[in-house]
Amino acid sequence: MRRSVLVVFLVLAVTNVAVEAISRRGSFLAGGLLGLGLGAAASRGFGFPGYYGGYYGGGYYPMGGYYPMGGYYPMGGFYPSYHTFGGYYG
């Protein structure tokens, strides 16, 4: 279990860096979809339900996170959503 948790956090960290890089270059759609897809796949693929599963792909709200479709904010992931789809909330 500990190993899978470490792998999940590693995948999510890499995802966040990648989304951040993509979104800063202006590819907002690609950044949002990457954050959504990899974030959800990481939590589900490693059987990471409950608290963290809610953040990344189905738990507290549909399709990931506190808000729908990825991460803390819509269509973006963790922090990269600040730069994805045009601002803090999108």
From Swiss-Prot:
It is found in: Secreted. Keywords: Secreted, Signal. Its main location: secreted. Prismatic layer of shell (at protein level). Residues 1-21 form the signal peptide. GO terms for cellular component: extracellular region. This is Glycine and tyrosine-rich protein. It comes from Pinctada maxima.
